[in-house]
Amino acid sequence: MFCLEDQVVLIAGGSQGLGKQFGQKYWDESRHSKIILVSRSDVKLRNAITDITGGRQEPVELVMPEVAASEPSASGSSAINLSKSSNHAGFESELRSNSNRSSSSLKESTNVVTHLTTNAADSRIVYIACDLSDPDAVERMFVTLQHNNLLPTQVLACAGGSIPKLFTDLTAKELEMGVKMNYMTTLFVIHKAAQMVPQAHLILFSSSTAFFPFIGYSQYAPAKVSLKALTSILRHELPNTRISCVYPGNFYSEGYVLEEMSKPDITKSIEGSSYPISCEECCDKIVWWLNRGYDDVTTDSIGWFLMSLDMGLNKHNNNSAYWFVQWLIGVIANLLVVPFYMVLCSYQINKWHKQNKNKNTLL
């Protein structure tokens, strides 16, 4: 149901964390798959490929073509317009049309990409440095993939990150970063993939906080809830496309270490027994469930239980492990367990507020 072999896999957020771990898994467990790592940082991507391959392969970059300044996109910056291209033929037609209108600039940039085709063809793993929160950059990325015959068969939208703080302690920049990292990066990649390669397997990465958003995650959880909603909508609109959504719990990564530095004590208290698993174990669990045909995937028992409490209207197309048991648990727990837990949770939060109010009074 989910095969690592003979794929062209695009891993958004592939320079570190879970995305990098997926790159490692494809490298170790396949022989003929093409692996494309994408993130903003050229240096991190090069280091990731060196780590994944053990230094046995030089990092190969697919350089995105520039476009003529005379052809501005609707957003005001230069880009090749792919919005009307819903299949390969449409994409190629649009590309030819744009090439004719802006021949000098696009020809020069196309030569750059064509120059790299041989290296890309010989490499099992390549990278593209791209700001995935910029829709124009995502369009140019797909131009690059098309030129190199690397349109993906699987898309893993792993990009994201959390800055756990109280809402009023967050800066406007951090809030903006949360929306860009955790929603827009996935939105634009999945949107373009759905237009260009509707037969590709689309895998979105949300979070177990999407089932239970709580204090300390205002920069992160709302975007992850949005991805859960987006998944439900896409399953309505794209019935012939396999669309999976992963809801990981805590796992060790570079991002997790940084999160613990800013995470409020009350957030840690409510998280309680949600102990982080290794990044490798998290990756293995996701692949294990996807391989068995499940498309709503959690990585720990707490995430699975929280999902069972969320079997709402859009869950008619839910495809998670033991979904009927989840439904039964959800009915019982929502009636008998959740009310008591929410009283306890409210008590913890109110107690924390009073303690902090007293501290501020003393100061």
Curated annotation (Swiss-Prot):
GO annotations of cellular component type: endoplasmic reticulum membrane; lipid droplet
Binding positions (NADPH): G13, S15, G17, R40, K44, D131, L132
Catalytically driven reaction(s): sphinganine + NADP(+) = 3-oxosphinganine + NADPH + H(+)
Disulfide bonds: none
Membrane topology value: Single-pass membrane protein
Subcellular location: Endoplasmic reticulum membrane
Presence of the UniProt keyword NAD in the record: no
Entry superkingdom: Eukaryota
GO biological process terms, semicolon-separated: 3-keto-sphinganine metabolic process; sphingolipid biosynthetic process
Organism of derivation: Candida glabrata (strain ATCC 2001 / BCRC 20586 / JCM 3761 / NBRC 0622 / NRRL Y-65 / CBS 138) (Yeast)
Record's keyword annotation contains Oxidoreductase: yes
Family indicated by similarity: Belongs to the short-chain dehydrogenases/reductases (SDR) family.
Renumbered ranges of motif GXSXG: 13-17
Pfam family, one: adh_short
Catalytic residue positions: S206 (proton donor), Y220 (proton acceptor), K224 (lowers pka of active site tyr)
Pathway participation: Lipid metabolism; sphingolipid metabolism
Residue positions binding NADP(+): L10, L18, D131, Y220, K224, S253
Molecular function (Gene Ontology), one example: NADPH binding
Record field: transmembrane: 324-344
Alphabetical keyword list: Endoplasmic reticulum, Lipid metabolism, Membrane, NADP, Nucleotide-binding, Oxidoreductase, Sphingolipid metabolism, Transmembrane, Transmembrane helix
SUPFAM superfamilies from the UniProt entry: NAD(P)-binding Rossmann-fold domains (SSF51735)
Protein name: 3-ketodihydrosphingosine reductase TSC10
EC id: 1.1.1.102
Broadest EC class assigned to this enzyme: oxidoreductase
Function noted in UniProt: Catalyzes the reduction of 3'-oxosphinganine (3-ketodihydrosphingosine/KDS) to sphinganine (dihydrosphingosine/DHS), the second step of de novo sphingolipid biosynthesis.
